[in-house]
């Protein structure tokens, strides 16, 4: 039975959100509902044929637009994994292993669309270590995630004037858009939506520096995100429609960050910046762009802002008149003032949820982060204010944790030429796992050689062979791996270099075939499978017209060889071998 979680008091929440909107507070999208779910009090264990077991637990919280899970502790043994999926299984996270889940800290899995969610833990028979899964909170999302619903084909969250980033207006900003992220922030039990950007630095070490607004780390009552809260922030990459019209949304994300620097003091917000470092390297397959920036005081005559208004997919707003300087709090010249321009596909403005979004100059360099303003679809002439990178560089305070400079120019490289400019870049140093093999189809008992194709010059390799002997290897190119189990087998490779680790799982990569011989035959064939057949073996014989002629069932057999006498009439038969969920088809010719 699923764990039914009581819906939060939405009437009270909506009233609070209405009051917050009137006072330009952060855009709340969700609330954490406390739960206590673990092996000892919830879910169901299932023993698997041949060993191993699964623990499965489902949670339902009616009315949710999306649901995520917060873990007080999660510790998985090597070889074990978890999947998290929606009730209809249209959205899936996983497999997550001990490689992907950080140790000794809290963790979260991102919200999935709908009001029901299931966690499935798989434990192979070889595991001796005790896993720990302690779910302490259900993340109840009630707005801002409309585009993540696979059934939706319209952009429902943000204003109708907004322009999708892959319309014509975004053609010259395709690199920069890959450095813009949607952020689901956690402040205590409250969840907010903001926008941020991934930054390059002069060391070009691709550390995962993420910039947003300082006020994104506060709730509507000025409560501040704790260090523990930051470990459960979620950063969404490439959250956009594939074209100018709704459709083709993809969702990729990383979890967790560490706060490095913030502009705010108890008396003044300053230039309203927050700089973080992601706890995990940005996966190479995200093809993320590390944005360049300009900390000089030069004005920009034109440019764009790329953002996630109201938590929606990525939008682009364009300015075509020179910026001016102004203030948000009490300190002068902390912000750029921006007026937006109409374009071919709309009139891009900003909205709640756009906070922290990058402002780019005409050279494509980041020069500001959004604090707020009064532009919206019914007030397109309103002015928006972006904290200036030139001010954030060193002017908010004297310590490193109030400046951008120590983190963006750690070696003081830019002091030599006097230009505080850094171009953006894609990361060509990351390890990206990939591999191939000398063959993909083998008979029972056959051997395969594997070849590493990973980018980034890995220094360590860890292979996992489902059904293989040995089941693991640490060489670069392992050879002679024996597969003596019937069916399609998964192969996983984890590679590591000086910068990161990456993994890839190729499902059903090796097709281990039953041996049907002799073929051609004189009416009798022998079928060799394997002894791992607790689920039983079914052999079906079809004639050339597709009609079933024979059916044999072997339940609980420990044999790996079966002799079948084929029908006396006919020269061509199809032999179907079924073992559990594995099905193979063989053509057999009979000589009379």
Regions found by a protein language model. Give the residues of each.
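A short beta-strand segment in extracellular, disulfide-stabilized domains
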Residues: 445-454, 524-528
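Short, surface-exposed beta-strand/strand-loop-strand elements in extracellular ectodomains
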Residues: 76-90
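Surface-exposed, flexible coil segments in extracellular/virion-facing regions
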Residues: 458-481
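C-terminal outer-membrane/trafficking sorting elements
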Residues: 460-464, 486-494, 502-517, 521-592
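Catalytic nucleophile loop of clan PA
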Residues: 197-208, 348-370
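Proline-enriched interdomain boundary motifs that mark the N-terminal boundary
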Residues: 429-437, 513-516
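C-terminal subregion of chymotrypsin/trypsin-like serine protease catalytic domains
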Residues: 210, 225-229, 247-257, 266, ...
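Serine endopeptidase catalytic core focused on the charge-relay Asp
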Residues: 112-339, 352
